Amino acid sequence: MTYREVFGVVLLSAASALAPVWADNFDYDTRRAPALLVCDRDSEHGRVAAARTCYQALLRSTRDGLVRAEAQWALGDVKSANDEFRALVNADARALQPRLRWGRLFLATHQYADAVKLFQEALAIDAQDKGARLAMARVMAERYDGDVRKLLATLLEEDPTLIEGQLLMARVELENGKYDAAATAAAQALKLAEQQQRAPLEAWSQLAAIELARGADTQRWTGPALAYNPRYGDIFASLAHFEVMRRRYLEASVWLRQAVQVQPDLWTAHEELGVNQLRLGDREGARVALTRAYSGDPFSATTVNTLRLLDSLEQFNFERMTQPDAIMQLHKKESAALRPYVEQLMRESMATFGKRYGYTPNEPVTVELYPDHDDFAVRIAGLPGIGLLGVTFGHLVAMDSPSGRQTGEFHWGSTLWHEMAHVYTLSVTDHRVPRWLSEGISVFEEWRTGPTPGVSLAPPVLTAFAEGKFLPVAQLDEGFIRPSYPEQVQVSYMQAGLICLFIEERWGFDKLASFLRQFTRDNNTAAAVQANFAMEPAAFDKEFTASVQKRFAPYLADPKKWLPTMQRAAKALEARDWKEASSASQQAVALLPEFTPADSPYLMLAKAQEGAGDSAAATATLLAWRKAGGWDPDGLRWLAKLLLQAQRPVEATAVLDAVNYADPLRAPGHAELGELLLTAGKAQEAVREYSVLLALDPLDTAAANFGLARAWRLAGDLPQSRRRLLEALETAPNYRPAQKLLLEMTGDPTP
């Protein structure tokens, strides 16, 4: 069976694997059957043959369905275990433990929805069951979803002897950069494991990861772990996980190679190695590791999907730029249409950030654009984040192409600019920069130097600020990694951007650049703030809060006023009450001029002004909207139309050019822009627009070729011009404009 044939197959419907497929399954629940614990001892010490014999003997000797299911799971016979768990649950509506363990089986295969359903059923049976609550905490921890720390704190306050609770708390604290708290929890887990005679391996893994984060020697903990179980590769896979969390992908691959060397049948580590090599741009290395993972676990969705993604790369063009050195991976169906704009943004961003941050890439920067969002989702598998538009792995950027989302859903040019900033902030600091600062600088650069000018944000960000939900600067990473409320990730992005803006306005850009350089060595935010700004983090937070309060004072004076004002404007527009619509829209703009999306009050105001017959006022409003950061493609096209009506072609040209970085794959705009560029004598830009127009396969190819012929003639390339004229006439032999120009060129060899 090939991986293409099993795509979409649910793992739990697989045939018997009878081999270790996932990382070790440790069950710390005191309700685990003593007979299983005997076999577990052999498994935990790496005595594979003895463990197999023990579990097989249990299957022959017991009729206890739960014990049988656990033994089948331990032997890798997932299908039989799944069937056994199902039978137990179907036989007893109040069977709590079978539900929990069945859910854990789903959790081990990353089928979170099925796992959560079973855990919720268990909680419905007993809302206070610690095993069920711990299971939900593990789901939250693995999915980076919800305030898992609060849940764990409650559980551990009730029962501090929960080994898994201490381990999860250690993981969460470590991911939040709280190394002392993580070490305390991990040490407690180790102590409890010894007291309860359970395997200390996961506790050693956590302690090793903490040592790694502190820059210390992990051998202190990996040594005892391998002495306890010479085949315990998961300790190295755990170290790799935390390196990935820190975006240190090269280091992660080193640990993953150790993991599979120690435990060759740890298929999850082979899989993660393959995924990680792809993050590093090593497609062949990725394929080797993923093929190995597939040989042991042909039903992993991540393995199968990533192998299919690698196969699909034959549908892409890989185009090399020079000066600067860069590679564009663009799908063949849209490569010709997108390349000019991608290349321009890459050149501009690399020149801009190279100067601002004092770094020249030492290897080619690669940008990958995916027209199928599902492919992009596979590309970033295993990373925390919600609704990501792009990701950066060092010198490699992957993102949705403009066709990967609905028109107007995202500004692909700003996304690319944002991600290119990450290339520089990560590289300057050798990936040590905190997530919040790297994201903050990227947002800040969108506002300051990117293709959409202006500081643009939405009311929920300021509402969160007003409610005291902005995090202290020293804790801001937590808002990205483990959000405690639904909007916190987006709020944290904006808070980070506003902090960078505050630094620039308070001390100047050079101080922001020097703050970034505080992380060229291992450092934390609190120490970096003290060193760079000569103030305690609390004092920094106080000044930043005051700056936000001042900048957004009109909105923050009464956060509940803005929405009713917007609703009043919308209602008046619908009633064609232009005066009331204008008044309400102006009030909404004044309250929050930074709100610039497609439903912004600027656009409502412009509609009201145009409805009242004042096109000049509508034009001025739309120009203000664009300056503030507005980029909705329909709004920009409307602005260009008004500018042309007002005989302002230069400004209209700039606006239509801006549309290309929001919505470049619609043909009509390129013809209009091409004509304006020809009129302005901008030959190369006109060549670009008509070339893109032809790549989009317009209905009137004769007119497009004619436009391109005129552009080439203006550029002085007469052979290209004649070639395009002949193309136009081949499509439409009676196309008089092309006939006329060809006659002119035949008689006059000069442009």
Regions found by a protein language model. Name each.
Residues 16-30, 44, 175, 408-411, ...:
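Long, contiguous interaction/recruitment modules in multidomain scaffold/adaptor proteins
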Residues 32, 62-66, 96-97, 130-131, ...:
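Helix-start (N-cap) detector for alpha-helical repeat units in TPR-like alpha-solenoids
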Residues 61, 91, 125, 158, ...:
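Structural marker of alpha-solenoid helical repeat scaffolds
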Residues 117, 150-151, 192, 220, ...:
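Juxtacatalytic substrate-recognition/specificity segment
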